[in-house]
Amino acid sequence: MQRMTMMVCPHDTAKDPERWFLFSQYLSQRAGHLVHFEQSLDFPEFQSKMAQADLIYANPQHTLKLFDEHGFIPLTRAASLFDEAVLVTCAECEATVADFHQASVATVPSMLVTQVALKSLARSGIAPQSLQPASTWMGVVQAIYNGEARFGILYKDFYEGMSKLSRKQVRVVSETAERSVYHCFMLAPRHADHVDALRKVMLGMADDERGAAILRDLHMDRL
């Protein structure tokens, strides 16, 4: 039985990584490969190892990098999950989306979800004057909490994964519903001959009782 290492975007393993162990176990039993889930504690670790992995559940940014620079093959994606943004302000501030126009907005500019937010704002004729760069989403929260920025853009999944105490540091003004970018399962090119078999197993999970239960725990209806 061939061994495969599976890695998952750290945002998706921050809480209850056991779900992904069950997912890898299911693939091992159904696809004929020993799929080993290797958890990354943070993004620097994930980014340093992802090109050596065999199977990856990657965010949109990393999906493009894996495809363009390393030849990874898209397998499938969660049918109903999209990467969206939340627009936030300081906890004690009263604000509307219109207040983002010509304002300085803290965000992580390199992440695609920032572009999702800007596209959503532009549709309403709103254009921030400048983007105040942060290296991480928590850096955006800290900039707002410390009074260095009044407005911010956050990755929705990051915000929802924050502790209740951390969420109290900001106030949500709005959230996007663009449904344009998403995480994707990517397979290393050295396993190109296994694409069809793996994809068949993954696409059939929703029609199998145990597979469907695993997907539900991952907040996925079907692949």
Predicted regions and their residues:
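A ligand-binding cleft/hinge motif common to bilobed small-molecule-binding domains
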Residues: N59-E69, A143-Q169
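Generic structural signal for residues in well-ordered beta-strands
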Residues: V35-F37, S130-L131, V170-V172
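Bilobed "Venus flytrap"/periplasmic-binding protein-like clamshell domains
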Residues: T5-Y26, S40, E84-V141, N146, ...
